[in-house]
Amino acid sequence: MAEERMIESFDGTQLFSRKDTAENQRAVAVISHGLAEHLGRYDALAKTLLSNGFTVYRYEQRGHARSDGKRTHFDDFNEMPDDLKTIMDLAKEENSDTPIFLIGHSMGGFTAAAFGTKYPGQAAGIVLSGALTRYNNQLFGQLPMDLPEDTYLDNELGEGVCSDPAVVEAYANDPMVEKKISVALINQFGTGIDWLKANAKNFTDPVLVLHGNEDGLVAEKDSRDFYGEIGSADKTLKIYASLMHEIFNEPSKYKIYDEVVEWIQERL
């Protein structure tokens, strides 16, 4: 059963969300998407989670797709983990006494890592995919960018997302993928990553850190550094040979989904 609705975040911003309820629910998974994309790009992952008894909550980050807010714009990086907290709180309210896991990809991985750092112990476990937790690959050059915050740059991320040409083509032609990215958003990555690094020891949740070693957008070293610096006792790092940025969309994605499911099941 699927339910789509607008959820009011901490500052009144309306976030588009979708809840898919598992028939024989064992746990809940909340998915946080990446820069310029939308929740529909996680349909295959959600379907696998559902079939394993995980109710799935997804939402669109502010300024993305069907959510409110200035397009691809953040005034403060804290808006990312605080919007996510709104969704996590909703999931807890609707699923009391059920473990709630968090899955974040790329910018959504930053969001999930920041959530775990700011609100430790709220998630039963966190899965990070190609997460922007450091800035070893200076994709946007030195931060902050010396441009007005309201400047918008073309979204040129498409070529680096995946080795599957069909995924690259679908991304380019997807009307819900944002075509412009604000300097304000990019500069908040710089501020947020500095904060994440300074507070690494505060991240203590169980975590599965996943990265493709052919990722041309977010450096594999970001995940290695994050993994090495956090305070979690239960932590696993997995680097996939020959995979690009979107490991959840690579041809071997179902094998990776199974590994995510297995990791969650071991913590129930």
Segments the model singles out, each with a brief description of its role:
Residues T236-L268:
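Catalytic active-site module of serine/aspartate enzymes centered on a nucleophile-bearing elbow/loop
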Residues M1-A22:
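N-terminal cap/lid segment of alpha/beta-hydrolase-fold proteins
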Residues R41, A46-G69:
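Conserved alpha/beta-hydrolase
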Residues A36-L39, A65-N95:
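Catalytic nucleophile-loop/oxyanion-hole region of alpha/beta-hydrolase
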Residues R26, H33-E37, N213:
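Active-site glycine-rich loops that stabilize anionic/oxyanionic intermediates
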Residues F203, V209-H211, D215:
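Short beta-strand/loop motif that positions the catalytic acidic residue
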Residues D205, A219-G228:
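Short alpha-helix in the alpha/beta-hydrolase fold that links the catalytic acid
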Residues G109-P120, I126:
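Short glycine-enriched nucleophile-adjacent loop
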